[in-house]
Amino acid sequence: MNPVDYLRISLIDRCNFRCQYCMPEGVKLDYILRSELLTDDELLTLIKAVFIPLGFTKFRLTGGEPLLRPGVVQLVRDIAALPQTEDLSMTTNGFLLSRMAKELYQAGLKRINISLDSLNQETFDKIIGNFGASKWQQTWEGIQTAYEVGFNPLKLNVVIIPGINEGEIEDLAALTIDRNWHVRFIEFMPIGNRELFSDRAWVPSEEIRQTIRQKWGLIESTIKGNGPADVFQIPGGKGTLGFISQMSECFCDRCNRMRLSADGWLRPCLLNETGQIDLKTALRQGIKTTELREQVREILAIKPNINYQERESGTQTGTYQRTMSQIGG
């Protein structure tokens, strides 16, 4: 198993989109009270006194939608300024990027992943649960702005949902031909969206690869990331195609990450909900960071067992209690 040096940090569980796979329609969401969110000071304390001493050097800011977090640019600046920070990135829906991308880049954010599940305005709005004025154009402009200010690599995250956007696989893959963009197809997961998942199921990565292969051919890329994606290229293309196959092709041996929710729960495995520890409450109760560090060290020691043996028994009820937006997936 890879060294665990990567922490995904959810800044907020709220979002200005309501994507079906992340915040399912009809599911009642109990949003975290602002007073229960980790404050900037608490988060920086945990990073500096708990995670960095244990070897964490790569940090990704997620949500919900992280750009809704008040003061997010200053938080980026503070994390980027830590001498041990080797990599600081963000996952966003892109809607606010057209006015925030430059400031984020100048603050020290160098890599960005943007969710883009459709190039069709109507389909895009359907997936994100938007019934008012379309949000497609502003999102697309945000992607363009992020690339123009210098984010490299710029990655686009795509979840293919049967019967909704599976007809766009070729169009989305084609974005990598003339642009140095990296499109990543992520298999749809049954976390907090059991009804939609049961209704729609998922498209295996190999089926997506085969669709692309039949159109243009597909070769393994010499560009490799530091995560679970299998990386390919369309011959002659400038960008890459990544496939994250958490449903069809177990990659637990390559896992190098943990997740910290916006309210301070540390989750060692995305699929395991029972092995989490509550760092925020302990911190607010005055537990020393040295003790918290030892608790995290213990979780690190058993993470391989959680990944390999407890991956499929990650809930006590058989149903995940939190949605992707609440976990910071």
Curated annotation (Swiss-Prot):
Binds 2 [4Fe-4S] clusters. Binds 1 [4Fe-4S] cluster coordinated with 3 cysteines and an exchangeable S-adenosyl-L-methionine and 1 [4Fe-4S] cluster coordinated with 3 cysteines and the GTP-derived substrate. It catalyses: GTP + AH2 + S-adenosyl-L-methionine = (8S)-3',8-cyclo-7,8-dihydroguanosine 5'-triphosphate + 5'-deoxyadenosine + L-methionine + A + H(+). Pathway: Cofactor biosynthesis; molybdopterin biosynthesis. [4Fe-4S] cluster 1 binds at C15, C19, C22. Its cofactor is [4Fe-4S] cluster. Belongs to the radical SAM superfamily. MoaA family. This is GTP 3',8-cyclase. It comes from Rippkaea orientalis (strain PCC 8801 / RF-1) (Cyanothece sp. (strain PCC 8801)).
